[in-house]
Amino acid sequence: MKLKFKKQAYQTDATSAAVNLFAGQEKIASTFTVMEERQLSLLQNEYGYGNALLIDDKKMLENMQEVQRRFNLPLTNDIEDKRFCIDMETATGKTFVYTQTILELNRRYGFTKFIVVVPSVAIREGVKKSLDATKEYFSQA
């Protein structure tokens, strides 16, 4: 059985909110295996290697507050930890949204490293099934 996926406005809004946090970020053209030494120094911190964030905290705060205004959320000033949350109800397509967000972050900004944490083996297996089911859809997007 082949599933058909339909764009949902709330899912597109969630992806847009996450991606727009990084507005102004230059696209980094790199891969995990082939990097210039100059690029590696941009990615390294005390935790290891990650995506090179080239926008400053002030710009990220402006971006975050713009997203908050767009969705009528209370404005906050705390981006010190750079932890952002998109809350979605059960069975609303969270896996679809974060997969779409990952692909869009890669397309726009060249981000290539993502960590997805799930609370149990059962949910991990559900995520794997969802990724398998959406593989064709996202490869055509």
Regions picked out by a protein language model, each given a short descriptive name:
Residues M1-A141:
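RecA-like P-loop NTPase motor core of helicase/translocase proteins
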